[in-house]
């Protein structure tokens, strides 16, 4: 059994240092892998990332993360990456990585994702250059997911880690007028094509916990949605089947 601890939208700052450190300390002995689905900081300052880094230094399990929109706000993502790396956190930006957990290879494809919308409210590849640039950015994110999933096809467990949502299901509860800015269905296309066992994202604070891409489970692990610091998902490493039938999740909070 592989225990994955997942969280998004921690929005760390010096004011939340004690809470964040306590949340990570509580993971000791409870998780085999930690996945952070973006918005680690309040406004993208390296000093805020240091709060996360300090908390992570107490853990001896693999930690993978992607950045979110908040983490990009101050245009200091290179510094944030350095801070996180100093604590052993592997930041994934259109990349993939893997780790060994009890003899099973766990592959993680990580990227921020981007906006674009869903059927009925999707941005087109048409019009002003700025609009087409947005479309191209989402294309690049989707292409990175495709490359990553092909690269980890040999892994026993395959996880996609995003910030923006690839499905409409987990946006239920958010105002429909902002769905376009919460994710894009185009992020789901390579996942449906190449397969995964689990997809995680955040960003949608007022969204819903659970969705799917075909038979592949998708979870919005924003702390505002889960109602806790981390959500623990258990994957049966003895026989993980594509489509995630053996992903066990406790009942989400009402």
Protein language model annotation of sequence segments:
Residues 1, 99-102, 179, 185-195, ...:
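Binuclear metal-dependent phosphoesterase catalytic core
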Residues 10-12, 78-179, 222-223:
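Conserved catalytic scaffold of divalent metal-dependent phosphoesterases
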Residues 6-8, 34-39, 63-69, 90-95, ...:
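Active-site neighborhood of phospho(di)ester-bond hydrolases with catalytic His/Asp-centered motifs
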Residues 27-28, 56, 84, 149, ...:
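Short hydrophobic patches on amphipathic alpha-helices
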Residues 2, 32, 106-108, 157-159, ...:
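Alpha/beta-hydrolase fold active-site loops
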Residues 31, 60, 88, 155-156, ...:
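Short, well-ordered alpha-helix to beta-strand connector turns
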Residues 1-62, 72-79, 131, 135, ...:
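N-terminal active-site segment of His-dependent metallophosphoesterases
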Residues 11-16, 41-46, 70-77, 98-101, ...:
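Active-site environment of divalent metal-dependent phosphoester hydrolases
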